[in-house]
Amino acid sequence: MAVEIKKVTTKAELKKFIRFNYEFYKDNPYSVPDLYDDMLNTFSPQKNAAFEFCEADYFLALRDGKIVGRVAAIINRRANDTWNKHTVRFGWIDFIDDIEVSTALINTVKEWGRERGMTEIEGPLGFTDMDAEGMLIEGFDQLSTMATIYNYPYYPQHMERLGMKKSADWVEMKIYEPDHIP
């Protein structure tokens, strides 16, 4: 069955958008979920100051009426002006291991951006650099943190198949306190 992309237009749909991540990773011992109320505030134009210079829409991917993916499409006009770019960001992306689903989500963001004059796509990024960014490419068997994005190992493979290339390496380190400080 074909993938249907639905724009989130109601609070109930936004709640489904947020909760999909919890359901999707509920059996994964390494994923640390975001706090639900924090996500509601992040996606709210009334509560997130980034909406003063950003615009965004959220999309759900459905198959047979069941949510199989999600993505946020974001334009940060301040960043685009600063860097002299026309970039649409994709963020909060999650999808089942199906290239049709990931393709539909990314193509939706590209088209959304094109309709608004954007010529490039970049992500995963949030509204600003204060949001979680990047895509895990190794360390899937390590406990994530609330400050980073956790994703399944097939995500980078899907992005590569969609023609995307890594632009930077971001490294997270765990530092242990020694038992004895010399």
What are these regions (language model features)?
Residues 80-163:
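Acyl-donor binding region in acyl/amide transferases
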Residues 47, 74-78:
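Alpha-helical subdomain
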Residues 71-75, 92, 122-127, 168-170:
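Glycine-rich, histidine-containing beta strand-loop boundary motifs that form or position
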Residues 44-60:
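A short helix-loop-beta-strand connector motif used in the catalytic cores of GNAT acetyltransferases and
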